[in-house]
């Protein structure tokens, strides 16, 4: 599985990835035209990425190619959904409501609504590991992918210093699970909209994407909430 903005997925590099046995690639395309893409992705490469996606779909056989999109304005949801579907041209697609990346971004009118409860991630049988780390360490273990941008607050350990088992059973991870049990969430979780129980957050999908299952996993996060 590879999730990427897809900028480099072209030519020989793309073909080499597919030929090596890649079975799933997801293009992250936030914005349904060049203007909105430039605003949200901070990139002028909208047309290039769309062309890369088309080329990859025409070349790949066993590799499943999908695109991932976020609704920019919930008051304009149906229009944006249709624009994203046009971009996907019948390919695999998933369209989600906007999220705030653990409270880092103020999303205004797109703010999610719902009951606050644990997202389940501190209890689920997966571990998020970064390439880098703090203070010269590597393999930083994070609570989930949503804390991207708040890594200094949210590092639970480093695989360069300890085993995954030691980190999983260690003080920081144990404290995080306790906080999610009591509802006394740490700062890097407290404002995250993944704590909100919003069943309509997945706006549209035409493949086996499940709201409460992460790609490449079999467990259901509802079992850990």
Q: Model-predicted segments: where are they?
A:
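Alpha-helix termination/capping residues and helix-transition junctions
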Residues: 19, 87-90, 186
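Flexible mid-to-C-terminal extensions adjoining Fe-S/redox cofactors in radical SAM and related proteins
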Residues: 141, 146-225
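Short aromatic-enriched loop/helix-cap "lid" or pocket-rim segments at secondary-structure transitions
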Residues: 13-14, 39, 77-81, 105-108, ...
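A short acidic, often aromatic-flanked loop/helix-cap motif at beta-alpha or helix-coil junctions
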Residues: 73-75, 98-105, 163-166
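Short, aromatic/basic amphipathic alpha-helical patches
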Residues: 79-89
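Radical SAM/AdoMet-radical enzyme domain recognition
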Residues: 1-79, 93-96
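Hydrophobic "anchor" residues
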Residues: 134-142
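Structured beta-strand/loop patches that form or line metal/cofactor-binding pockets in enzymes
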Residues: 98-126, 130
